[in-house]
Curated annotation (Swiss-Prot):
It holds the Pfam family CADH_Y-type_LIR. It is linked to Palmoplantar keratoderma 1, striate, focal, or diffuse: A dermatological disorder characterized by thickening of the skin on the palms and soles, and longitudinal hyperkeratotic lesions on the palms, running the length of each finger. Three calcium ions are usually bound at the interface of each cadherin domain and rigidify the connections, imparting a strong curvature to the full-length ectodomain. It comes from Homo sapiens. Expressed in all suprabasal layers of the epidermis, with the highest expression seen in the granular layer (at protein level). InterPro entries: Cadherin-domain_protein, Cadherin-like_dom, Cadherin-like_sf, Cadherin_CS, Cadherin_Y-type_LIR, Catenin-bd_sf, Desmosomal_cadherin. Residues 485-534, 1014-1035 are annotated as: Disordered. This is Desmoglein-1.
Length: 1049
């Protein structure tokens, strides 16, 4: 930015202000005369008023008259009249008086005397301009006269001697005290700025303190303060103004600093070891004096010591009492020592202070023990009674000279009963007892009478004396006797049972056959008891009561009884398993289905198969025997557990469960007969799903539905025709969206069994009569073909001589039992609409039902992929469905519900998006084992032997798809696994149930025939009908699904 322009403008503005201030303003006012119409100009000039100039400052302590006049005032009114100037204020008409005077004519103000700033730092002079009448011509003016300061005052300390204190061993830079000094000179001026300095320290060994020159704070220089070395310091501090300059004024003060004591000295005992002697059985109040030395301040808690025992005084024989005046500990004996128990003692003592140690020496403190060796001197001791009193029991049937007990004195030197003493009775109330002078045996002098009992009140207390004539010593013992009531006089005392407990804790007992008397003595009171009669019996008493445990058991019993009705409601109570009234949990991965009776007709009745018992062959057998045929599977299925038996499998369990289930793939066996049913999702109900794959599956399903809906003709909407009147009948605008719909009668397939006959008539089907029940069966049993039998590619497969002729019958007939019975429909939880069933039966007398043998390998996760759309050329499925090239290279194949274990699904199952074409092949419900997808749809080799089925249903081809008839093949053999294929469609395709050669799916294990019959021609005009679209050149084919029900006999 260019500042030159702004500089020029600023200079011009300042110049104009200066010119204006120093010049006069003249204003011309125009006066218009209305009488004569003339205009006059009057000039009005404003003159600048000069009132005063700034007053000059006065320095204190000097003669300022040379600066007179220090100020001058002037009023503009002086030009027109006479003006008198006057002043007032401090120093004029207020003390101090007469410092300032004014010339009333000229307005000059003069100073007349010396001023002191410390007395009056400034003066305020009030100036007035008066006329001759004494009236103010101007407003009063305040004139300030400032007094300049000079350094004429020294610093002054608030105290001549400052006192402070600080603990020893304090950290460096610890605040001790703050000095306070003031200066009367002008504040915030160099003349009043004080600088502090320590000029002397006592003792002066080394400087221990520092002072802040600006604030006067005294702090420690280091942490070497030691009260034991110097207890007090004296400092001399100087304060100088003008910040300590040489021309400044100064003052001094004293500082006394006391060093406070802390517990930084570890106390110790004067001697490290002591040796003393003491006689046994004596007490001593001043056995030993222990002096403690501590360098801390005397009589303080840091100096007072406490002596304590570290070890050796476990019996609490000694105590130490401290003298706080001398810091001396006195060792006392408070409990007699026994020479026989111990001859010497080693005491270990330690010392500490009452106060806690300072943190500076806390880590240095280590406990130092001092040893005291105590020697116990033996003395000759007299006998004593231990314990000093004993209690006995005397019964009413005890007579004269009966023994009450023994009370002997013990020799303390040997610890045994004394043999040098004699015993005499001391206090003996009622003269009841007598004592043996040598043995100390107590006996009754006479039988206790009732009068003695009443006199003593049942309690006797006497004394016994032991006298040692050699030592001239006597010991006294106390005898306590409990006299029992005289109500027990009838008891007999034959032989006493005496049990004595001595002071050593040992029990001695003597017993006889009769338990009449028992004498007991305890350690504490030495109680001897004599119980007459059946004493042992009296000790036994019943103590039976109803406690909390019994109450708790009763409450628990009632609670269990309350749970019985609830348990009866929950359990089946012997009812049939899987009863119709119960609920069956639906697993997460189960595929729901609408049963045939959900559409029309009653629910089929379940059949009893309890008599169907499989016969288990030996473990080394390679075949599976068939089950006796006594019923037909309707709503019941059997769960089986299998074992591998080499080439075949052995069934180890059989369970009857009500429900609907389809059979799996038949096993390779030497003979097989019965009804074959398809698998269902019930077999994989317990398996989990791969959620990532399921998410992809649902996305593909949604795309397929979108593409399908886009290709379908819309109903109930206005059709768009490119050329009106061409390809559309007259009056076609209406609800009929598709001409071909008039001839579409596929909706009759879903009407149910009630309308089956009507549907057959509408479709023009040929009606076959029911079989005669008296038709004789053949006697030949069906035998499965060997595993290595080559299947036939086209045409009809060779029929085994063991089978009867193949007959196409209606859905209502079914062979079972010894004759031909009317069958119930085979229900599949996944079967919507009609299905194609291939049945093989024998002509023997007894037809056995099929045995559905499951693989004992854990079921893999099964993923259902529905409507995966892709072109045939991109999928490269010619190896699996052998069909000729279609007329359009962009043929589309729609595969619905491809069921395979998810653990082995390859990435090649994802087929590219289809292109529009006029020919469409729809394959629905393809259930393919991984072993059968060896071609372009390669699977993981670990599932090569999976026993699964492939069912292809509703194969719809366009007008150009005519080469499928009789040439359909599926590549990739299953190996040892059998397969049943059922294919339906509008084209003339066929699938051989006996087998397909060329590496196709081997069906040799079935031994029957499976054919597709009653298929409508694909040359229907429905596939040539042009669907309305936006472009006339785009042709699309409508997909019509056909399916019928056939049985091949």
């Amino acid at each position: 930015m260019d500042w030159s322009f702004f500089r020029v403008v600023a200079m011009l503005f300042i110049f104009l202000v200066v010119v204006e201030v120093n010049s006069e303003f003249r204003i011309q006012v125009r006066d218009y005369n209305t009488k004569n119409g003339t205009i006059k100009w009057h000039s009005i000039r404003r003159q600048k008023r000069e009132w005063i100039k700034f007053a000059a400052a006065c320095r204190e302590g000097e003669d300022n008259s040379k600066r007179n006049p220090i100020a001058k005032i002037h009023s503009d009114c002086a030009a027109n009249q006479q003006v008198t100037y006057r002043i007032s204020g401090v120093g004029i008409d207020q003390p101090p008086y007469g410092i300032f005077v004014i010339n009333q004519k000229t307005g000059e103000i003069n100073i007349t005397s010396i001023v002191d700033r410390e007395v009056t730092p400034f003066f305020i002079i009030y100036c007035r301009a008066l006329n001759s009448m004494g009236q103010d011509l101007e407003r009063p003016l305040e004139l300030r006269v400032r007094v300049l300061d000079i350094n004429d005052n020294p610093p002054v300390f608030s105290m001549a001697t400052f006192a402070g204190q600080i603990e020893e061993n304090s950290n460096a830079n610890t605040l001790v005290m703050i000095l306070n000094a003031t200066d009367a000179d002008e504040p915030n001026n160099l003349n009043s700025k004080i600088a502090f300095k320590i000029i002397r320290q006592e003792p002066s060994d080394s400087p221990m303190f520092i002072i802040n020159r600006n604030t006067g704070e005294i702090r420690t220089m280091n942490n070497f303060l030691d009260r034991e070395q110097y207890g007090q310091y004296a400092l001399a501090v100087r304060g100088s103004d003008r910040d300590g300059g040489a021309d400044g004024m100064s003052a001094e003060c004293e500082c006394n600093i006391k060093i406070l004591d802390v517990n930084d000295n570890i106390p110790y005992m004067e001697q490290s070891s002591y040796t003393i002697e003491i006689q046994e059985n004596t007490l001593n109040s001043n056995l030993l004096e222990i002096r403690v030395i501590d360098l801390d301040e005397e009589f303080s808690a840091n100096w007072m010591a406490v002596i304590f025992f570290i070890s050796g005084n476990e019996g609490n024989w000694f105590e130490i009492e401290m003298n706080e005046r001398t810091n001396v500990g006195i060792l006392k004996v408070v409990k007699p020592l026994d020479y026989e128990a111990m001859q010497s003692l080693q005491l270990s003592i330690g010392v500490r202070n009452k106060a806690e140690f300072h943190h500076s020496i806390m880590s240095q403190y280590k406990l130092k023990a001092s040893a005291i060796s105590v020697t116990v001197l033996n003395v000759i001791e007299g006998p004593v009674f231990r314990p000093g009193s004993k209690t006995y029991v005397v019964t009413g049937n005890m007579g004269s000279n009966d023994k009450v007990g023994d009370f002997v004195a013990t020799d303390l030197d040997t610890g045994r009963p004394s043999t040098t003493v004699r015993y005499v009775m001391g206090n003996n109330p009622a003269d009841l007892l007598a004592v043996d002078s040598r043995t100390g045996k107590l006996t009754l002098k006479n039988k206790v009478t009732k009068e003695q009992y009443n006199m003593l009140g049942g309690k006797y207390q006497g004394t016994i004396l032991s006298i040692d004539d050699n030592l001239q010593r006597t010991c006294t013992g106390t005898i306590n006797i409990n006299i029992q009531s005289f109500g027990n006089d009838d008891r007999t005392n034959t032989e006493p049972n005496t049990k004595i407990t001595t002071n050593t804790g040992r029990q001695e007992s003597t017993s006889s056959t009769n338990y009449d008397t028992s004498t007991t003595s305890t350690d504490s009171s030495q109680v001897y008891s004599s119980e007459p009669g059946n004493g042992a019996k009296d000790l036994l008493s019943d103590n039976v009561h109803f406690g909390p445990a019994g109450i708790g058991l009763l409450i628990m019993g009632f609670l269990v009884l309350g749970l019985v009705p609830f348990l009866m409601i929950c359990c089946d109570c012997g009812g049939a398993p899987r009863s119709a009234a119960g609920f069956e949990p639906v697993p997460e991965c189960s595929d729901g289905a609408i049963h045939s009776w959900a559409v029309e007709g009653p629910q089929p009745e379940p059949r009893d198969i309890t008599t169907v018992i499989p016969q288990i062959p030996p473990d080394n057998a390679n075949i599976i025997e068939c089950i006796d045929n006594s019923g037909v599977y309707t709503n019941e299925y059997g769960g089986r557990e299998m074992q591998d038996l080499g080439g075949g499998e052995r069934m180890t369990g059989f369970e009857l469960t009500e429900g609907v289930k389809t059979s799996g793939m038949p096993e390779i066996c030497q003979e097989y007969s019965g009804t074959l049913r398809r698998n269902s999702m019930r077999e994989c109900r317990e398996g989990g799903l791969n959620m990532n794959f399921m998410e992809s599956y649902f996305c593909q399903k949604a795309y397929a539905y979108a593409d399908e809906d886009e290709g379908r003709p819309s109903n109930d909407c206005l059709l768009i025709y490119d050329i009106e009147g061409v390809g559309s009948p007259a009056g076609s605008v209406g609800c009929c969206s598709f001409i071909g719909e008039d001839l579409d009668d596929s909706f009759l397939d879903t009407l149910g069994p009630k309308f089956k006959k009507l549907a057959d008539i509408s479709l023009g089907k040929e009606s076959y009569p029911d079989l005669d029940p008296s038709w004789p069966p053949q006697s030949t049993e069906p035998v499965c073909l060997p595993q290595e039998t080559e299947p036939v590619v086209s045409g009809h497969p060779p029929i085994s001589p063991h089978f009867g002729t193949t007959t196409v019958i209606s859905e209502s007939t079914y062979p079972s039992g010894p004759g031909v019975l009317h069958p119930k429909p085979i229900l599949d939880p996944l079967g919507y609409g009609n299905v194609t069933v291939t049945e093989s039966y024998t002509t023997s007398d007894t037809l056995k039902p099929s045995v559905h043998v499951h693989d004992n390998r854990p079921a893999s996760n099964v993923v259902v992929t529905e409507r995966v759309v892709g072109p045939i050329s991109g999928a490269d499925l010619h190896g699996m469905l052998e069909m000729p090239d279609l007329r359009d290279g962009s043929n589309v194949i729609v595969t619905e519900r491809v069921i395979a274990p998810s653990s082995s699904l390859p990435t090649s199952l994802t087929i590219h998006h289809p292109r529009e074409s006029s020919n469409v092949v729809v394959t629905e419900r393809v259930i393919q084992p991984t072993s059968g997808m060896i071609g372009s749809l390669s699977m993981h080799p670990e599932l090569a032997n999976a026993h699964n089925v492939i069912v292809t249903e509703r194969v719809v081809s366009g007008a150009g798809v005519t080469g499928i008839s009789g040439t359909t093949g599926i590549s990739g053999g299953i190996g040892s696994s059998g397969l049943v294929g059922t294919s339906m469609g509008a084209g003339s395709g066929a699938l051989s149930g006996a087998g397909i050669s060329g590496g196709g799916i081997g069906l040799s294990s079935l031994g029957g025939t499976a054919s597709i019959g009653h298929m409508r021609s694909s040359s229907d005009h429905h596939f040539n009908q042009t669907i309305g679209s936006a472009s006339p050149s785009t042709a699309r084919s409508r997909i019509t699904k056909y399916s019928t029900v056939q049985y091949s006999k």
